A protein has these predicted regions:
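Membrane-interface helix starts
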Residues: 16-35, 263-267, 296, 366, ...
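Short, membrane-interfacial amphipathic segments enriched in basic
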Residues: 1-13, 411-430
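N-terminal membrane-entry
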Residues: 259-276, 367
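Basic-flanked hydrophobic alpha-helices used for secretion and membrane insertion
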Residues: 48-259, 465, 469-471
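C-terminal membrane-exit region of the final transmembrane helix in multipass inner-membrane proteins
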Residues: 9-15, 287-288, 365-409, 428, ...
């Protein structure tokens, strides 16, 4: 008592005493929260990273970042679309011409506006060098086309002789063999097994040779990224008026396919998330339940000697909040080490090795870290609330005498006298059985926790094997 400070508040004294008394439990609880936050943050980030890679993969396979467009669109159709609240942006694309080699087409020539190219087409390409064509004689080719032409080391501004023709067979202006200036080049991933490719020419070349935008393909970027293609098509059909020859083409968005390919369905995703949270709750609850008996006895003793119940609860809340916050910070550091150090290499090796080189992507998402911390703190609060409910339900004397075998409602029936049963040479079986089922509630919670852990391990293995592109 030499170092005792008589000026300390009662709560401070109780907190110090509780911290010293429960050092082992608090240390174990800190480790559990650290691991839980780190694992949940890492799992969420891994799912997010995998989804982003799948979205990029789907965009590259489609050749564009949008999944919905209208064929033979007009200015009137564009005006109708701009009035819909779910439409983010609209672009134009026109398949105007083609490149031939001995009368065989090997490349489509496309004209797009600025919005269509920058926001809806360029994200599907990689290694983009140069700019979109602006002058009449400029062209932008893919590396596949350049290799077909025998050009291994392309340079922006180089002159290339090409046999070009408009898709309108009645328009012969500006067709035939002619020299183009290479304004840029890119790598595409659409139809990799096919020799066909796509090139971009300037809008000025179309205007000079008497072509017009209409009719053209109207590219639609909408907000319903996680709706199916049929749902989007149905929504557009009910809100716009189509003319003769116009039709809506709506595929499943890249985001929708990313979730479907990884989880199978939204239902399974929700089920898996609930299992993770329930397993986490049981994990923390079991840790608190280890010292439940001694904690209640100590709180009962404190109430008997004059400490109010609300003071005990206040001390408990502060103690758990401190452990939760420090454990969350440590878990964030643990998860950050995995996300910055291991996850990019893991994703690149498992998912992007056989398709396209993984571009620089930001996998650390603060919102996922906040979500993981909130879930863990909430789960810790629920587990602590179970302990506080028992404290409120029992009187101080009942808390002092509390054991795991306590029953709150005494039966009026006279207890039956059980006959002694001899187990012969194996009495340990009898003792193990009696200890195992001494508290059926604890036995049930522990069994459920172990079952959930095994199920999560199996589900994780199935998901990882299912999304591995090498399989």
């Amino acid at each position: 008592m030499e170092n005792y400070d008589c000026n300390q508040s009662a709560e401070r004294v109780l907190m110090d005493a509780s911290r010293k008394k429960n050092q082992n439990r608090n240390r174990l609880l800190f480790i559990v929260i650290t691991i839980t936050v780190g694992v949940i943050f890492s799992v969420f980030s891994l799912i997010y990273g995998k989804m982003e890679i799948d979205i990029q993969k789907n965009m590259k396979a489609d050749g564009m970042a949008v999944s919905t467009y209208i064929e033979n669109g007009t200015a009137d159709m564009t005006q109708q679309l701009t009035q819909l609240p779910c439409i983010e942006s609209i672009g134009k694309e026109k398949f105007a011409g083609k490149l031939l080699d001995d009368s065989i087409k090997y490349c489509d020539c496309v004209i797009t506006d600025v919005t269509g190219f920058e926001k809806m087409i360029r994200p599907a390409f990689t290694n983009v060098v140069g700019t979109y064509p602006e002058k009449e004689n400029e062209i932008m080719l893919s590396t596949k086309t350049l290799q077909y032409l025998g050009i291994k080391n392309p340079e922006v501004g180089m002159e290339i002789e090409l046999d070009f023709y408009w898709n309108d067979i009645f328009n012969t202006s500006g067709t035939g063999m002619q020299n183009f200036l290479l304004s840029g080049y890119f790598t595409e991933y659409q139809n990799q097994t096919s020799g066909a490719s796509v090139a971009f020419i300037s809008e000025k070349s179309m205007e000079k040779n008497g072509l017009q935008w209409e009719p053209c393909r109207i590219l639609i970027d909408h907000t319903k990224k996680y709706s199916s293609g049929s749902q989007i098509e149905h929504m557009l059909t009910n809100n716009i008026k189509l003319n003769e020859g116009q039709r809506i083409v709506s595929m499943n968005p890249a985001e929708y396919r990313a979730i479907s390919e990884m989880m199978g369905s939204y239902g399974f995703a929700v089920f898996f998330s609930v299992m993770v949270l329930l397993s986490m709750f049981l994990f923390i609850y079991n840790i608190l339940n280890i010292s439940l008996e001694k904690d209640l006895q100590r709180y009962g003793l404190l109430q008997v000697i004059g400490v109010e119940q609300k003071q005990n609860i206040k001390v408990m809340n502060r103690e758990m909040l401190k452990i939760g916050l420090t454990g969350s910070i440590a878990g964030a550091v643990l998860g950050g080490m995995f996300i910055w150090g291991i996850m990019p290499l893991l994703l690149e090796k498992m998912y992007a090795e056989n398709t396209w080189k993984l571009e620089r992507m930001v996998f650390f998402q603060p919102k996922l870290l906040i979500l993981a911390i909130v879930l863990v703190i909430f789960t810790l609060g629920v587990a602590v609330e179970c302990l506080k409910r028992k404290m409120r339900k029992l009187s101080p004397l009942e808390c002092m005498k509390y054991t795991e075998a306590v029953t709150y409602h005494k039966s009026r029936k006279k207890p039956k006298i059980k006959k002694f049963r001899c187990w012969g040479k194996h009495p340990e079986i009898y003792l193990a059985k009696k200890y195992l089922f001494r508290n059926k509630k604890t036995f049930g919670i522990t069994s459920l926790s172990l079952w959930l852990g095994c199920e999560l391990a199996l589900c994780s293995a199935v998901i990882v094997n299912g999304v591995d592109l090498q399989n």
